Amino acid sequence: MSDFSQTVPELVAWARKNDFSISLPTERLAFLMAIATLNGERMDGEMSEGELIDAFRHVSQGFDQTSETITIRANNAINDLVRQRLLNRFTSEQAEGNAIYRLTPLGIGITDYYIRQREFSTLRLSMQLSIVAQELSRAADAAEEDGDEFHWHRNVFAPLKYSVAEIFDSIDLSQRVMDEQQQGVKDDIAALLNQDWRAAISSCEQLLTETSSTLRELQDTLEAAGDKLQTSLLSIQDTIMNNPHNLEFVDKLVFDLQNKLDRIVSWGQQTIDLWIGYDRHVHKFIRTAIDMDKNRVFAQRLRQSVQSYFDNPWALTFANADRLLDMRDEELTLRSEEVTGELPPELEYEEFSEMREQLIALVEQALHKYKAQQIPLDLSEVMREYLAQYPRSRHFDVARIVVDQAVRLGVADTDFTGLPALWQAINEYGAKVQAHVIDKY
């Protein structure tokens, strides 16, 4: 979790005072990544000037540059990376002229983005979420203990701040890399279709299928772990509310982690929805191109036949056959079973948006009696009754609809007292709601 304690003017003055600047042309960036790759093979994490020159020689060969001035250009490149604080140079009086070099945190961060962050896989995500689950579980257990403020700092705040938050940031960064990779796939598909769409159909289909499969696997992994992580965070939050110590710093961190987790989980579903739309667009383009090309080829052949009739006479025979109806659905969801998964039988022919509209209408009608008869509305009891009628996967959506409709009816007098409402369970899976009884319509 990134926290900025300095103000914008302070950061600007700091950057100006230290003369920070980064300029990495393609050659310099390739050199930096070569250093990081070779450095990863060394136990001490240090490289000599000769090893850096050897790395630069590989880069120079890759860019087809002359080998006559390699030493001079390598020294210039090394000095440039040192000046930009991407490399640290260490010298000693005992070994004068034999400096050693280490990558700075900035250099590691840049190379990590270009090299390691692109290794985003379901296995890596599963391992990260597993570590987060263990840390959150330990933090929740520590929160249950009756400890002082130092105990909360050491056993709750520290793991959340320096382990869970950093892994969340790593997952968030990886998702942003996935966004770039999807854009790269779109560019590849566009290039294939512009060159020769006939030959590109199978390649486009493979790219679309692989990306859809990857997104679905990642989303399944996120959804499987999301509920457990959110439960641990809610447990810590409940403990904070009942603790006499001033734990606002922990409460704020937990709130930030909840928002981060929500963004991470929602990213997957949103990305899948956008990719389905793009998938349809590509297939519709291919179908249109096939139809247009078919007509264009026929028209071209007919034109040539008419022009060469006297050289090659021909006869036209036609039959009035029964018309064949094209039953293809232009709006067919392509590979929906692969992208969105199989629906249960009772929902097979229903869209979620239609279900949501129907549910809103039913809830609105059911809650109207409270306003008409001036009956106090206990939100926890109403939500408990509704959630019992639906599977667990729909509880969040149903609860949100019930709350949206309930708050439109009126407010609670006790809201104006400033006293917090009690947390009350609304299902068997640990979900709770905090709301006063609505009695003023």
UniProtKB/Swiss-Prot annotation:
Keyword ATP-binding among UniProt keywords: no
Protein name, entry field: Chromosome partition protein MukF
Species of provenance: Pectobacterium atrosepticum (strain SCRI 1043 / ATCC BAA-672)
Compartments where located: Cytoplasm, Nucleoid
GO molecular function per UniProt: calcium ion binding
One of the protein's GO biological processes: chromosome segregation
Quaternary structure annotation from Swiss-Prot or TrEMBL: Interacts, and probably forms a ternary complex, with MukE and MukB via its C-terminal region. The complex formation is stimulated by calcium or magnesium. It is required for an interaction between MukE and MukB.
Family: Belongs to the MukF family.
Highest taxon of source: Bacteria
